[in-house]
């Protein structure tokens, strides 16, 4: 039988040691599970542990008498999962500790069961001391990497604390209603009939914010393309394109296809939409999203900075360029960014953005 704590530890190890995205690491594990509650628990443990990683890591360092060996990175991640349960979840302490001990066995770490038990019990006993450990470091206190804390503090000297705190808040579940299927008011009424409380977004005409998250497969009509999950800010992109019938549109850096779909929903009478992305695996996600929504576009694998690889030579009336960025603005939704992003990435990303802009201008109609 699968132990959810062990599964979550494996997911986190793939992010921390393997530098995989949390989405990809979770997909590997969740694709093999059918139980909705187990899937939800693994997601909660993985997202939560990574959200508070730099705080939990400081706590773990204080509780361990000596560092774990590199080959025991899965055990280290399991201990972080256990600490997350004790410090941030309502799981009874005895259950969190016992299940973590059992998880060590499932990770083939029978020798470490006593260590897991001792570390987690000491977390309870030494609570006041551990609060002092957290308070001694801005990285631990605000649960962000030290380099990012310094950058935010320098750039927003009056607001840096609130900016970092915002990165640790749970994000709301925001939907985009497919207006080819329902009006927003009609879908809100459908949610109301199923006792799912939600509110319309004021700044995005297709947006809905749920008062409490629910699994996407529990959303009415989700599998049939009635709605998509998309942040409210991201929904502004298609609206700002000022789309009209007969236009040729390019969505560059299009994966996973949320904005591509939004463009097609917003103006079904386009002359054509081309969606390009450099990552073959992520291009498949564009296809998957369009298939679920019953939409179609020309989807190409290619580098948007090298149009000669894929461009047909005809200019576009509108181009949406969602250029790669640091993603620091969406850390609350993607907490793995705290571990995956490095200081040197910022300069490299800025150069990439400039190259993409230079490549896109000649493709735009005068």
Label each region the model flagged:
Residues 1-366:
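S-adenosylmethionine
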């Amino acid at each position: 039988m699968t132990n959810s704590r062990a599964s979550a530890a494996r997911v986190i190890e793939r992010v921390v040691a393997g530098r995989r995205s949390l989405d990809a690491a979770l997909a590997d594990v969740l694709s093999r599970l059918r139980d909705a509650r187990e899937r939800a628990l693994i997601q909660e443990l993985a997202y939560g542990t990574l959200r508070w990683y730099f705080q939990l890591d400081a706590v773990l360092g204080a509780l361990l008498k000596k560092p774990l060996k590199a080959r025991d990175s899965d055990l280290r991640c399991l201990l972080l999962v256990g600490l997350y349960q004790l410090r941030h979840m309502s799981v009874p302490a005895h259950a969190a500790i016992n299940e973590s001990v059992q998880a060590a066995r499932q990770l083939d770490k029978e020798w470490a069961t006593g260590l897991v038990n001792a570390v987690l019990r000491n977390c309870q006993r030494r609570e006041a001391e551990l609060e002092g450990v957290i308070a001694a470091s801005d990285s631990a206190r605000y649960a962000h990497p030290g380099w990012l804390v310094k950058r935010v503090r320098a750039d927003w000297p009056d607001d840096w604390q609130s900016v970092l705190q915002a990165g640790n808040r749970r994000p709301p579940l925001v939907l985009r209603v497919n207006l080819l299927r329902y009006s927003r008011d009609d879908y809100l009424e459908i949610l109301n009939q199923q006792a799912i409380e939600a509110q319309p977004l004021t700044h995005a005409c297709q947006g809905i914010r749920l008062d409490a998250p629910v699994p996407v497969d529990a959303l009415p009509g989700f599998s049939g393309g009635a709605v998509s999950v998309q942040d409210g800010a991201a929904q502004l992109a298609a609206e700002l394109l000022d789309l009209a019938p007969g236009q040729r549109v390019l969505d560059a850096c299009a994966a996973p296809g949320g904005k591509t779909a939004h463009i097609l929903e917003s103006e079904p009478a386009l002359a054509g939409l081309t969606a390009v992305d450099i990552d073959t695996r992520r291009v498949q996600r564009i296809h998957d999203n369009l298939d679920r929504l019953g939409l179609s576009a020309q989807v190409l694998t290619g580098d948007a900075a090298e149009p000669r690889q894929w461009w047909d030579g005809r200019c576009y009336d509108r181009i949406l360029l969602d250029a790669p960025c640091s993603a620091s603005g969406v850390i609350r939704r993607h907490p793995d960014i705290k571990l995956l992003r490095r200081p040197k990435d910022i300069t490299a990303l800025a150069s990439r953005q400039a190259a993409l802009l230079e490549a896109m201008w000649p493709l735009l109609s005068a």
